[in-house]
């Protein structure tokens, strides 16, 4: 949650006091390949061209960013450091610029007949262009040609001092490499380059101006090596500076809004420091602070002026809202106004309100506190289901919010609150939005400054964007009326309802369109912006329109977008074309845009980067910032309109105009308001003391002064009365509010409430029939029990904090029966009122049922939570036979330590499948229908503990298995761990390969779990040759292996000199041969030693009819839990198996798992 509000008068510290808030305006875009990007961040309510400052943000300086631009051909570099004064010549005199003069009104040269003006004697009651006499003074900042950024501060408030910081910012390195600080004490006529440390190169990163005493300035300086940082402090508008080393690196400074010497420093290490003597001494306040979410106390709301509101991260990683006084901000003195964690970057303190959001169990809730009372949920319509919420404005004891509801993508709905900021009603749907850099959101709505209650908004429906205006804070909206004639006096042929005027408000889809509407507090009713006529807003049309009666009538003034600046309360409007070519003239109007004149402000065309006037727009002096080429120095041109006006305005110089909406109704927001404006025939200065408001008269209340209350919506236009508010289907107006406590009273809503800040009296009162009712005793509803931190799995012996919440119902008379599932039972009162958690500790693993029953005489509710208490998993081993027969059933077994029956979930990935098999058992059975290598992966998850193991299996259609046994001495040394079994299998395989010359890759020895220690030897067949029907090499390999085993040639040593002998296990058969699934099974008979050759031939000839001692087995696909051989001749034949066999079934009941088992 962040502020994304429209422009309005500032109330808090300026941007030099703190970094731009989330609601700060976005950086302006360069119009159409314009190589210089103007970023205006003015320190006072200064009149710089560009976007208006945000609420709570003053504009102390202008930052200009220079990017490469092709220099115009034939331009000479200007001289630097000297003044160049130029007065306009007489009409008709030759202009200073070479080349043919363009036509009237064209930029780049003055229009014919207007190249210079001299002041003539004032004519009584008559204004004439002959009276205009402007003085332009140019100054070049010599030596700063390489600097690509500039920050400008005009102190204002009867001061003639201007400070300019130019710097070379290296984007790749992310820091400033060079800088220069210039100071003017004559309104910008001349500048002096300041030397902060004689003989030492000083790099200034930024400067900050105190909003309450703009004579006080702080410069932030750093070394190129980034090893140290210093501040330079001034209390005389930069005439002198005092160096102050600091032990941290400043990210931004935040001045106190009322006390000039108090300042906060947010560092690059996310630490917060405070100084009470303008930066001379610093004290650490807090660490792990969220940037841009630090706020000073609000005057008139916070009791302690030294209070600081902070969003900070605690040691557990959660973000908290905390407050403390700057003189004592230790951990013991921190106050947490909200007990739980909040979402990162959501804290906003603004005027009477504090906002944040908190997400738990995948549900986000938005909270508000009015005038520092307890936090309550913001009540939006029940099924708004907001995806995002942005604060638009908070002035006049009311909150405007933009809510992106569940179905919206690039639009928001606008809601208006009651004075407490709790209950919200819809005022406008589908306001256009845009997501900018760093995930910031801009809502296309603008508050018109100078006249309260007036807003402009761009609504997007079915892809079409149209501009709307309201005069009563969103109660009613209308389209802008188009002008009947264009700037050339031709008919526009634009008639409602098919055609209206549409304006770019705050941004545009085209990044080269500024999309700015210009309004000022000092010029009420004067609105100027870029847009077009038509059925919808066109992003690339930027015609300039102006109104002087607050949007009632509009006029077109230019065909292209211009930079706009208001001087002398709007008495002079200055415009410079927003273009990528160099300019030398400006346009100005002294009659609210009815007529325009041009002035040649420099003899050499310059690329204009921006305009700036003294804060408050109350003077007639302005500065144009620019440069002749990218490689040239910065050039500042001071334009002084004061010689054109000889006197101050008197009462006879003003006329009045009355505010009205588009229907002609003059009772707006419950009053008739009239304003003063200078007559077009008067040639005088309004001056600093001018006030525009003239008179106001309270009106009688009408139904239009009321809007729909929370839970109600206005009827559609098809119904008889469009002003009727009807209850939504989910809202029962007769039900007491959720926070209605026994003994209190509440007002049943009739569906209407008066528009906040509407001052009408008498007349219609649509709330007069409201009835005060006693809050009844209500049963508890929405009871919830959870573990603090949202975990439901804990470890034995760990402290668990149970939190009980109740959304509705009485809490004072309700009793709470708590059963924690392990024998602990208790009865509580005021459990949900205090919010104190219940601390408990489970000693034994298991699943515990936690229940809370809330009951009073009106009813009851119950909440249940199942808590898993388990030890973390230590080891996981996937036990599986490495060789599998085609289409044979095989067991995959996960050996887990420690065993957690009924608490562990196993995830099995077989082959390339992304979808796992889930089981609560530690083993599964499967089959493989294709030969090749198959990877099997298992994950065991128990609570927050997850382990994984993986194995590669070979799926073959032919292989032999020979059962093995070991001498009994081995059992005493068998720890029954997977690693030990693998090592024994490897040594047996290696010895057999060495003694028989059978390739080691064709032998696999698998030692079975448990005692006695047994093993199976897998003899793999090489790939068959295409021309070979049957090979006897397999028989020879088996005979060789049997021979070395019978000869007791395979043995290995254990510790202590114990030798272990490996032999064939007596199963009644020597070996089994497994064939492919589609052919017949053939097994070679072991030749009996000593038989005659003829006997051997006869036995081989009739081997299909005489079973002998060889087992002829076929592949069986039936499932066998223990996977023993399907063909057995005795009880001992269980060891002679086919592709799936008993060696896969793990048995660990005879020996405990060793502690060094790892996954």
Swiss-Prot record:
<comment type="function">
    <text>The heterodimer formed by NGFR and SORCS2 functions as receptor for the precursor forms of NGF (proNGF) and BDNF (proBDNF). ProNGF and proBDNF binding both promote axon growth cone collapse (in vitro). Plays a role in the regulation of dendritic spine density in hippocampus neurons. Required for normal neurite branching and extension in response to BDNF. Plays a role in BDNF-dependent hippocampal synaptic plasticity. Together with NGFR and NTRK2, is required both for BDNF-mediated synaptic long-term depression and long-term potentiation.</text>
</comment>
<feature type="region of interest" description="Disordered">
    <location>
        <begin position="1"/>
        <end position="36"/>
    </location>
</feature>
<dbReference type="GO" id="GO:0043197">
    <property type="term" value="C:dendritic spine"/>
</dbReference>
<feature type="glycosylation site" description="N-linked (GlcNAc...) asparagine">
    <location>
        <position position="158"/>
    </location>
</feature>
<keyword id="KW-0968">Cytoplasmic vesicle</keyword>
<feature type="disulfide bond">
    <location>
        <begin position="649"/>
        <end position="684"/>
    </location>
</feature>
<dbReference type="GO" id="GO:0008188">
    <property type="term" value="F:neuropeptide receptor activity"/>
</dbReference>
<keyword id="KW-0628">Postsynaptic cell membrane</keyword>
<dbReference type="GO" id="GO:0043231">
    <property type="term" value="C:intracellular membrane-bounded organelle"/>
</dbReference>
<feature type="glycosylation site" description="N-linked (GlcNAc...) asparagine">
    <location>
        <position position="902"/>
    </location>
</feature>
<feature type="repeat" description="BNR 6">
    <location>
        <begin position="587"/>
        <end position="598"/>
    </location>
</feature>
<dbReference type="GO" id="GO:0007218">
    <property type="term" value="P:neuropeptide signaling pathway"/>
</dbReference>
<feature type="repeat" description="BNR 3">
    <location>
        <begin position="273"/>
        <end position="284"/>
    </location>
</feature>
<keyword id="KW-0677">Repeat</keyword>
<feature type="glycosylation site" description="N-linked (GlcNAc...) asparagine">
    <location>
        <position position="891"/>
    </location>
</feature>
<comment type="subunit">
    <text>Homodimer (in vitro). Heterodimer with NGFR. The extracellular domains of the heterodimer bind the precursor form of NGF (proNGF). Has much higher affinity for proNGF than for mature NGF. Can also bind mature NGF and BDNF. Each chain in the receptor dimer interacts (via extracellular domain) with an NGF dimer (in vitro). Interacts with the precursor forms of BDNF (proBDNF) and NTF3 (proNT3). The cytoplasmic region of the heterodimer formed by NGFR and SORCS2 binds TRIO. ProNGF binding mediates dissociation of TRIO from the receptor complex. Interacts with SLC1A1. Interacts with VPS35.</text>
</comment>
<protein>
    <recommendedName>
        <fullName>VPS10 domain-containing receptor SorCS2</fullName>
    </recommendedName>
</protein>
<comment type="function">
    <text>SorCS2 104 kDa chain and SorCS2 18 kDa chain together promote Schwann cell apoptosis in response to proBDNF.</text>
</comment>
<feature type="disulfide bond">
    <location>
        <begin position="494"/>
        <end position="499"/>
    </location>
</feature>
<feature type="repeat" description="BNR 2">
    <location>
        <begin position="232"/>
        <end position="243"/>
    </location>
</feature>
<feature type="site" description="Cleavage">
    <location>
        <begin position="119"/>
        <end position="120"/>
    </location>
</feature>
<feature type="repeat" description="BNR 5">
    <location>
        <begin position="545"/>
        <end position="556"/>
    </location>
</feature>
<feature type="glycosylation site" description="N-linked (GlcNAc...) asparagine">
    <location>
        <position position="328"/>
    </location>
</feature>
<feature type="disulfide bond">
    <location>
        <begin position="740"/>
        <end position="775"/>
    </location>
</feature>
<feature type="glycosylation site" description="N-linked (GlcNAc...) asparagine">
    <location>
        <position position="830"/>
    </location>
</feature>
<keyword id="KW-0967">Endosome</keyword>
<keyword id="KW-0771">Synaptosome</keyword>
<keyword id="KW-0732">Signal</keyword>
<dbReference type="GO" id="GO:0031901">
    <property type="term" value="C:early endosome membrane"/>
</dbReference>
<feature type="repeat" description="BNR 1">
    <location>
        <begin position="182"/>
        <end position="193"/>
    </location>
</feature>
<keyword id="KW-1133">Transmembrane helix</keyword>
<feature type="disulfide bond">
    <location>
        <begin position="708"/>
        <end position="725"/>
    </location>
</feature>
<dbReference type="InterPro" id="IPR035986">
    <property type="entry name" value="PKD_dom_sf"/>
</dbReference>
<keyword id="KW-0812">Transmembrane</keyword>
<keyword id="KW-1003">Cell membrane</keyword>
<feature type="transmembrane region" description="Helical">
    <location>
        <begin position="1079"/>
        <end position="1099"/>
    </location>
</feature>
<comment type="similarity">
    <text>Belongs to the VPS10-related sortilin family. SORCS subfamily.</text>
</comment>
<feature type="site" description="Cleavage">
    <location>
        <begin position="1030"/>
        <end position="1031"/>
    </location>
</feature>
<dbReference type="GO" id="GO:0060292">
    <property type="term" value="P:long-term synaptic depression"/>
</dbReference>
<dbReference type="GO" id="GO:0098839">
    <property type="term" value="C:postsynaptic density membrane"/>
</dbReference>
<feature type="topological domain" description="Extracellular">
    <location>
        <begin position="51"/>
        <end position="1078"/>
    </location>
</feature>
<dbReference type="InterPro" id="IPR015943">
    <property type="entry name" value="WD40/YVTN_repeat-like_dom_sf"/>
</dbReference>
């Amino acid at each position: 949650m962040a502020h994304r509000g429209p422009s309005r008068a500032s109330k808090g510290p300026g941007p030099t006091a703190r970094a731009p808030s989330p609601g700060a305006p976005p950086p302006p875009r360069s119009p159409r390949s314009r190589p210089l990007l103007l970023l205006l961040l003015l320190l006072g309510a200064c009149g710089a061209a560009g976007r208006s400052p945000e609420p709570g943000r003053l504009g102390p300086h202008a930052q200009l960013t220079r990017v490469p631009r092709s220099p115009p051909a034939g331009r000479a570099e200007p001289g630097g450091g000297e003044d160049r004064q130029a007065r306009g010549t007489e009409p008709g005199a030759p202009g200073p610029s070479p080349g043919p003069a363009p036509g009237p009104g064209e930029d780049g040269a003055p229009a014919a007949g207007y190249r210079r003006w001299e002041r003539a004697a004032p004519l009584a009651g008559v204004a004439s262009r002959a009276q205009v006499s402007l003085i332009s003074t140019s100054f070049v900042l010599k030596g700063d040609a390489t600097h690509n950024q500039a920050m400008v501060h005009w102190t204002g408030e009867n001061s003639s001092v201007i400070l300019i910081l130019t710097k070379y910012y290296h984007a790749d390195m992310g820091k400033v490499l060079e800088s220069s600080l210039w100071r003017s004490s004559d309104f910008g006529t001349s500048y002096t380059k300041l030397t902060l440390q004689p003989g030492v190169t000083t790099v200034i990163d930024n400067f900050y101006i105190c909003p309450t005493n703009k004579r006080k300035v702080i410069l932030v300086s750093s070394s190129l090596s980034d090893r140290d940082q210093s501040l330079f402090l001034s209390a005389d508008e930069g005439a002198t500076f005092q160096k102050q080393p600091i032990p941290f690196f400043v990210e931004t400074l935040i001045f106190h809004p009322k006390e000039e010497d108090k300042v906060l420093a947010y560092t690059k290490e996310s630490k917060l420091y405070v100084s009470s003597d303008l930066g001379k001494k610093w004290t650490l306040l807090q660490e792990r602070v969220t940037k841009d979410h630090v706020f000073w106390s609000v005057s008139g709301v916070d009791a302690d002026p030294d209070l600081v509101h902070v969003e900070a991260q605690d040691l557990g990683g959660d973000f908290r809202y905390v407050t403390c006084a700057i003189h004592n901000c230790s951990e013991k003195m921190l106050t947490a106004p909200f007990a739980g964690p909040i979402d990162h970057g959501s804290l906003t303190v603004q005027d009477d309100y504090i906002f944040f959001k908190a997400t738990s169990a995948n549900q986000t809730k938005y909270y508000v506190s009015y005038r520092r009372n307890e936090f309550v949920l913001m009540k939006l319509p029940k099924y708004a289901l907001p995806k995002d919420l942005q604060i638009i404005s908070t002035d006049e004891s009311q909150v405007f919010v933009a809510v992106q509801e569940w179905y919206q993508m690039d639009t928001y709905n606008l809601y208006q609150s009651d004075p407490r900021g709790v209950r919200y009603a819809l005022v406008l749907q589908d306001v256009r939005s845009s997501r900018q850099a760093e995930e910031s959101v801009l809502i296309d709505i603008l508050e018109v400054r100078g006249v309260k209650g007036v807003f402009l908004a761009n609504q997007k429906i079915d892809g079409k964007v149209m501009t709307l205006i309201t005069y009563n804070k969103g109660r009613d909206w209308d389209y802008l009326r188009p002008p009947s004639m264009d700037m050339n006096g031709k008919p526009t042929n634009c008639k409602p309802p098919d055609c209206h005027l549409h304006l770019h408000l705050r941004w545009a889809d085209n990044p080269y369109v500024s999309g700015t509407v210009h309004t000022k507090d000092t010029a009420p009713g004067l609105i100027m912006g870029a847009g077009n006529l038509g059925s919808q807003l066109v992003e690339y049309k930027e015609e300039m329109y102006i109104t002087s009666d607050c949007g009632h009538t509009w006029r077109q003034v230019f065909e292209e977008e211009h930079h706009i600046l208001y001087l002398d309360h709007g008495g002079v409007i200055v415009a410079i074309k927003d273009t990528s070519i160099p300019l030398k003239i400006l346009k100005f109007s002294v009659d609210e845009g009815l007529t325009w004149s041009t002035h040649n402000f420099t003899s050499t065309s310059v690329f204009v980067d921006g305009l700036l006037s003294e804060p408050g727009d109350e003077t007639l002096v302005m500065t144009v910032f620019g440069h002749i080429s990218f490689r040239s120095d910065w050039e500042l041109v001071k334009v002084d309109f004061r010689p054109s006006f000889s006197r101050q305005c008197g009462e006879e110089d003003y006329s009045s105009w009355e505010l009205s909406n588009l229907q002609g109704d003059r009772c707006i927001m419950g009053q008739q308001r009239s304003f003063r404006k200078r007559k077009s025939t008067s040639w005088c200065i309004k001056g600093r003391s001018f006030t525009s408001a003239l008179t106001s008269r309270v009106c009688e209340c009408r139904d239009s002064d009321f809007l729909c209350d929370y839970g109600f919506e206005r009827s559609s236009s098809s119904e008889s009365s469009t002003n009727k508010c009807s209850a939504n289907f989910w809202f029962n107006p007769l039900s007491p509010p959720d926070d209605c406590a026994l003994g209190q009273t509440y007002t049943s809503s009739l569906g209407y409430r008066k528009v906040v800040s509407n001052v009408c009296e008498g007349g219609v009162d649509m709330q007069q029939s409201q009835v005060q009712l006693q809050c009844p005793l209500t049963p508890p509803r929405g009871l919830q029990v959870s573990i603090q931190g949202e975990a439901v799995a804990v470890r034995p012996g760990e402290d668990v904090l149970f939190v009980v919440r109740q959304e509705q119902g009485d809490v004072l008379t309700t009793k709470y029966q708590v059963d924690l599932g392990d024998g602990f039972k208790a009865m509580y009162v005021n459990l949900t009122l205090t919010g104190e958690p219940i601390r408990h500790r489970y000693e034994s693993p298991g699943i515990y049922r936690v229940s809370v029953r809330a009951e009073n005489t009106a009813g009851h509710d119950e909440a249940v939570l199942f808590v898993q208490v388990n030890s973390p998993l230590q080891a996981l081993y996937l036990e599986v036979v490495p060789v599998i027969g085609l289409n044979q059933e095989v067991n995959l077994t996960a050996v887990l330590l420690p065993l957690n029956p009924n608490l562990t979930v196993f995830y099995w990935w077989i082959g390339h499948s992304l979808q796992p098999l889930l089981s609560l058992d530690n083993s599964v059975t499967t089959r493989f229908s294709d030969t090749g290598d198959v990877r099997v992966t298992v994950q065991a998850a128990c609570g927050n503990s997850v382990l994984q193991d993986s194995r590669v299996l070979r799926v073959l259609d032919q292989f032999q298995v020979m059962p093995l046994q070991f001498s009994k001495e081995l059992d005493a040394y068998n720890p029954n761990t997977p690693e030990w079994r693998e090592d024994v299998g490897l040594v047996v395989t290696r010895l057999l390969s060495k003694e028989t010359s059978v390739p080691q890759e064709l032998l696999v020895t698998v030692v079975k779990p448990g005692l006695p220690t047994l093993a199976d030897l897998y003899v793999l067949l090489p790939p068959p040759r295409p021309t070979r029907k049957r090979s006897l090499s397999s028989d020879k390999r088996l005979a060789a292996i049997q021979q070395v085993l019978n000869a007791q040639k395979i043995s290995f040593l254990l510790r202590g000199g114990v030798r272990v002998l490996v032999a064939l296990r007596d199963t009644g058969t020597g070996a089994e041969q497994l064939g492919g699934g589609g052919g017949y099974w053939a097994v070679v008979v072991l030749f009996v030693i000593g038989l005659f050759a003829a006997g051997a031939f006869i036995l081989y000839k009739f081997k299909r009819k005489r079973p002998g001692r060889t087992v002829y087995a076929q592949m069986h696909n039936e499932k066998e839990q223990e996977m023993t051989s399907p063909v057995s001749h005795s009880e001992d034949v269980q060891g002679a198996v086919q592709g799936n066999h008993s060696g896969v079934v793990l048995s660990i009941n005879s020996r405990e798992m060793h502690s060094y088992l790892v996954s």
